[in-house]
From Swiss-Prot:
Involved in the regulation of the intracellular balance of NAD and NADP, and is a key enzyme in the biosynthesis of NADP. Catalyzes specifically the phosphorylation on 2'-hydroxyl of the adenosine moiety of NAD to yield NADP. It can use ATP and other nucleoside triphosphates (UTP, CTP, GTP, dATP, TTP) as phosphoryl donors, while nucleoside mono- or diphosphates and poly(P) cannot. The gene is nadK. One of its GO terms (biological process) is NADP biosynthetic process. Its cofactor is a divalent metal cation. GO terms for molecular function: ATP binding; metal ion binding; NAD binding; NAD+ kinase activity. It is found in: Cytoplasm. Optimum pH is between 7.2 and 7.5. This is NAD kinase.
């Protein structure tokens, strides 16, 4: 065993037997290598592991040096919002569909992870967004997002009227089905489907992408990640909400604004040494191959 990582957490929310098989393989392999292993409580229960050290996501974040998330991008997003608050590196084994964030191949994960544990990896920081629903700058409800914060109707699709302020300066008003505020990490997710640009992960930028705007002049906007975005509403209807990574929803009541800014902490994401962001884009999005 090397000194790069001593304590490793195993994280995920298994939905099918193949994911559980990967969890069990990973646990037993790490134990034979002499690492201290903490297994997320739900996984330990599903696998019926005995005499195993378990913990919540927060406890894994506090105690472990590395968290291995087994699952798809949704599993990674759910775990990473919590793990990003702690000094822990995170890597993913893909058991989902696209796998933009979980880039270890499950069929070759053991060898790839062995190289990572030896210190052969690429490290990068991904910033998060913090969203607040507040009234007169009094914080009421707050959440974070790794991919995006989305303004949308609560139940029935309809047009929304709102104003956008950037650093407290009026930028534009809009009538649309909603607005996607995305990080570079989220630029290949919901934002991409809505016609937003792809941003490389190292960019300190945020995109604002209209959803079905009621004007042909509405276009995606890219701003500095240090900016604060404020959304104000006409409140002709009271069923609006924002969602974070399509996993957490915060309702918006009459008289409330939404504030969105970059979080103070980052997700410490790591990849195998041969990782290439552009190769990932080409593979996942079906881009053309090299001509010569």
């Amino acid at each position: 065993m090397n000194n790069h990582f001593k304590c490793i957490g195993i994280v995920g929310h298994p939905r099918h037997p193949t994911a559980l098989t990967t969890h069990e393989m990973l646990y037993r392999w790490l134990c034979t290598k002499g690492y201290e292993v903490i297994v997320e409580q739900q996984i330990a229960h599903e696998l019926q592991l005995k005499n195993v050290k378990t913990g919540t996501l927060a406890e894994i974040g506090q105690l472990a040096d590395l968290a291995v998330v087994v699952g798809g991008d949704g599993n990674m997003l759910g775990a990473a919002r919590t793990l990003a608050r702690y000094d822990i590196k995170v890597i993913g084994i893909n058991r989902g569909n696209l796998g933009f964030l979980t880039d270890l191949d499950p069929d070759n994960a053991q060898q790839q992870l062995a190289d990572v544990l030896e210190g052969h990896y690429i490290s990068e920081k991904r910033f998060l967004l913090e969203a607040q629903v507040c009234q007169q700058d009094c914080q009421k409800r707050i959440s974070t997002a790794i991919n995006e914060v989305v303004l949308h109707p609560g139940k029935v699709a309809h047009m929304i009227e709102f104003e956008v302020y950037i650093d407290e300066i009026f930028a534009f008003s809009q009538r649309s089905d909603g607005l996607i505020i995305s990080t570079p990490t989220g630029s290949t997710a919901y934002s991409l489907s809505a016609g937003g640009p792809i941003l490389t992960p190292s960019l300190d930028a945020i995109t604002l992408v209209p959803m079905f705007p009621h004007t042909l002049s509405a276009r995606p906007l890219v701003i500095n990640s240090s900016s604060t975005i404020r959304l104000r509403f006409s409140h002709r209807r009271n069923d609006l909400e924002i969602s974070c990574d399509s996993q957490i929803a915060l309702p918006i009541q009459e008289g409330e604004d939404v504030l969105i800014r970059r979080c103070d902490y980052h997700l410490n994401l790591i990849h195998p040494k041969d990782y290439s962001y552009f190769n990932t884009l080409s593979t996942k999005l079906g881009w053309s191959k090299k001509l010569f």
